[in-house]
């Protein structure tokens, strides 16, 4: 191939003295070239070396030849193009490339310039050979450039379409109308805006209707739509939203009502201190004792002590059965400690099961209407303040009943103090002394 190309070049450029038949004689020919064209010589100087290095790549001649012509036509081209394709062993063509370079210094080479068109055909023939080596990088370099815009153009429309589809799907699912998902988004947007534009009159009518019926039948819905100048769909959706809101409100209220319902059930118990007393007495194991005992206590003392019924107005209604009266006798003995209760004190012994609980629970027994803390504060306030006898009674009971300070509260029930104090003044020591051992035995 090289020889054929060389002979062709000699035939083409045979009229010129600088050409030689031997492809290796170009070294001598290149010497005049640098004087004529330094750029061409530079560009072609590197090529002959490459040509010597790789004579096998004859197929690359045509492209190199084309590059040389392009370099000659545009001076700026040679430095840029040769490095691109000059790196691979494309240089063997310089023998041919050299002849076209000289035409510039002499005028006659211009006619041969068209003749090089003949070698270009081989270039078209030879590129397949070069295709194995050179065109691949060029094509690879060009292919991404060509493919990237096309791929990008293909991707963007797909991405847009997918996003639109997703938007449509989401909007369709949100409105609950998947059937019209594709065309619905604009309609849905308008419908949503219309929903937010309900007038106060429309809202009032809708609220009234919802108050009577949470679910509308279709005839009523049509009627409402005609009355309110709304569509059935708007009314239906409004009722759906309103029902959801109602459910949320009911849940919140349910939590409050459940806690509130417990509180009222608890509230009646606290007003009657008996509930608190019951809890305390359950610990003392004197459940029957409860608040009921104080009211009977208040009743008999009225007869025995002549106390005014006004002192225990509240406990009286809460009083229940007479059995507390038996306990009352014990309570009276513990609380009043009067000589009249000496026999009742024996009754207290009879209430053996009651004795200790009374001592422990006496604070509760002190006042059905009064909580234990009140009874705790009560004894010193009433008993100690009114008479030393009551104080001594408290001391006697405290010593007599080591079971608990509860009996110390015993004088506390002396809220009917004045009478208690007067009565206790008559036989304070005897009654308490007699009661004390009995209580201790209990």
Curated annotation (Swiss-Prot):
Do you know which InterPro entries this protein is assigned to? DUF4074, HD, HD_metazoa, Homeobox_Antennapedia_CS, Homeobox_CS, Homeodomain-like_sf
Output the SUPFAM superfamilies linked to this UniProt entry: Homeodomain-like
Which GO molecular function annotation, any one, does this entry have?
HMG box domain binding
Compartments, as annotated in UniProt? Nucleus
Q: Where is the composition biased (Low complexity)?
A: 126-135, 300-309
An example GO biological process term is: stem cell proliferation
Q: Which GO terms describe its cellular component?
A: nucleoplasm; nucleus
Q: What segments bear the compositional bias annotation Polar residues?
A: 165-177, 187-196, 276-285
Q: Which Pfam families match?
A: DUF4074 (PF13293), Homeodomain (PF00046)
Record's superkingdom?
Answer: Eukaryota
Could you tell me which residues form the DNA-binding region? 191-250
State the UniProt keywords alphabetically. Answer: Developmental protein, DNA-binding, Homeobox, Nucleus, Transcription, Transcription regulation
Bias type Pro residues, positions: 79-125
Annotated region (Disordered) at 73-147, 159-196, 247-310, 399-442
Q: Where is this motif: Antp-type hexapeptide?
A: 155-160
The UniProt entry's sequence similarity note says: Belongs to the Antp homeobox family.
Its function, per the record, reads:
Sequence-specific transcription factor which is part of a developmental regulatory system that provides cells with specific positional identities on the anterior-posterior axis.
Spell out the protein name for this chain.
Homeobox protein Hox-A3
Query: Source species, please?
Result: Bos taurus
